[in-house]
């Protein structure tokens, strides 16, 4: 029963900082040598990840931003532009994104910091983004404020070193945007708009399922 309780607690941890605190406290209570060795290794890996996150956030610069509907937060050294979005109509957010990234396709990723499937898909998103760097497409990640703090949002972006445009969006605006795309599936939700401005329902269900050839065809409306 005690073991089960510890597992539940660890899976509920929100950020690497929370996980490091949990592991540090757990190590003091472990007496079995091989288990202790395992936890010490995990704790070391977590602290290394936490150090990387903090370094990335500390190295981030102030951003003047280029989105009329959003407040700029920072620009990281790994290519992420962070903004907050509130007190604006969802329709304005969408139209302004189209105007800002004119002649580009938009890959919209609706997510939350507590969403396991969202986080699991991030490495695939980062991979396909790198593969289409030479293509006219903007990756825009919209994190809901529902259950996600701004600090958790920043830490998740730094944890995955996820470049692109990142929006921390008021939950009501995010819900309205998702409704505009007829989404009923919760997080993650993906919406794709090709470079001609046409929304393609169901074009992307999982980032892990995309390959470069498929995605390039989507971008150009083929």
Each PLM stretch: what is its role?
Residues 162, 169-220:
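Thiol/disulfide oxidoreductase modules built on the thioredoxin-like
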Residues 104-105, 122-143, 158, 213, ...:
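Conserved helix-turn-beta segment immediately C-terminal to the redox Cys motif
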Residues 91, 95-98, 126-129, 150, ...:
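Extracytoplasmic/secreted envelope proteins and their assembly/folding machinery
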Residues 59-61, 66-67, 72, 122, ...:
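C-terminal structured domains
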Residues 1-104:
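Oxidative protein folding and maturation machinery
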Residues 74, 130-174, 181-184:
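Conserved segment of the thioredoxin-like fold in thiol-based oxidoreductases
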Residues 105-106, 188:
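Alpha/beta-hydrolase fold active-site loops
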Residues 102, 110-127, 144, 148:
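Conserved redox-active cysteine motifs that mediate thiol-disulfide chemistry
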